[in-house]
């Protein structure tokens, strides 16, 4: 399994158990699903609860939402367009410092900055239609995931977007 973690905070943002793709080498787009589950349950794709277990759902609290948000404990936040631009300035500066700390070469840093700029240009025009989510630590300096609802095959599909160069892949 691959866990995609926020490079700055270490928060788990998503795993490869979700359907995802890389767009133009700069954005991860992760398909989400609406789910309902008993409080505390984590349902992974392919998991099959035992049919012999008694159903104890009668007294349990049921939570509903997007699988990615519930499983990774992402926290919704809000931004105006101006606030988001201010956030991006601080975020890109912190990322560049992190890349230097990781001893990335100048050419790697320049390529990552170019890709990050490309990703920002893709999301800024649709900012008013997006929802914003931060990682479990609620650190406002970390990566902010962007949620967009798109029409796919006449169905509304929630797609969570992450800046590729703000994530670290951890194989477990």
Curated annotation (Swiss-Prot):
Other comments on record: Secretion of this protein from cells may proceed via an ER/Golgi-independent pathway, probably mediated by secreted vesicles called exosomes.
Gene Ontology cellular component list: cytoplasm; extracellular region
TCTP domain mapped to chain residues: 1-172
A single GO molecular function term of this UniProt record: calcium ion binding
Family statement: Belongs to the TCTP family.
Protein name: Translationally-controlled tumor protein homolog
Role noted for this protein: Venom protein that causes edema, enhances vascular permeability and is likely related to the inflammatory activity of the venom.
Alphabetical UniProt keywords: Secreted
Subcellular location: Secreted
Domain of life: Eukaryota
Tissue specificity field: Expressed by the venom gland.
